[in-house]
Amino acid sequence: MTVGLLGGSFDPPHEGHVQISRAALKRFDLDQLWWLVTPGNPLKENPPASMTRRIKAAREIMDHPRVRISDIEARLNTRYTAQTLRELRKLYPQVRFVWLMGADNLAHFHRWKNWRGIMESVPVGVLARPGDRISARLSRAARIYSQHRIPAGQSHLLARASSPAWCFLNVPMTKASSTEIRKRGAWTG
């Protein structure tokens, strides 16, 4: 079984998360996709809204039979993606995981704790976000792992590829942004 992992604060979840989830399921040929609603993001200053509220909102907006909304990071008590992946691979040794991220995350991926370990342990699917395509493609991670990039036309091979492997997809985009939603006051913690 192949499972895409979309980690994030989801503070709040929005239509952009739904859109990239549907695209990832199809284009990366995934059996399932799990939203890993994180208790907190080590790279962000302000804490997110309550876990209960974010999980509830995620379940309301993402209604798909192959998508699971999960609080497993809180239950595993992991803080960093590399730790979470290590624990998930122990818990589910039969599952082939693919880490999913927006292009905005690839642009600063080199700031993540043990980011090379992530690239070396699971395939990584990168989905375009408004305004972040060029910075992502020129990022440190993209340059270092350029020889391991799977062309978008072969994205269906990513989930079964040996690590390191990554693929950048241009997908239809929405301008939805959790940051902008919070700035407008449409979501408060």
From Swiss-Prot:
Keyword RNA-binding (UniProt): no
EC code(s) of this entry: 2.7.7.18
Single GO term (MF): nicotinate-nucleotide adenylyltransferase activity
UniProt protein name: Probable nicotinate-nucleotide adenylyltransferase
Reactions the enzyme catalyzes: nicotinate beta-D-ribonucleotide + ATP + H(+) = deamido-NAD(+) + diphosphate
GO biological process entries: NAD biosynthetic process
Alphabetized Pfam families for the sequence: CTP_transf_like
Pathway: Cofactor biosynthesis; NAD(+) biosynthesis; deamido-NAD(+) from nicotinate D-ribonucleotide: step 1/1
Record bears the keyword Amino-acid biosynthesis: no
HAMAP family, alphabetized: NaMN_adenylyltr (MF_00244)
Species: Ruegeria sp. (strain TM1040)
Swiss-Prot/TrEMBL keywords: ATP-binding, NAD, Nucleotide-binding, Nucleotidyltransferase, Pyridine nucleotide biosynthesis, Transferase
UniProt function note: Catalyzes the reversible adenylation of nicotinate mononucleotide (NaMN) to nicotinic acid adenine dinucleotide (NaAD).
Family annotation (InterPro entries): Cyt_trans-like (IPR004821), NadD/NMNAT (IPR005248), Rossmann-like_a/b/a_fold (IPR014729)
UniProt similarity note: Belongs to the NadD family.
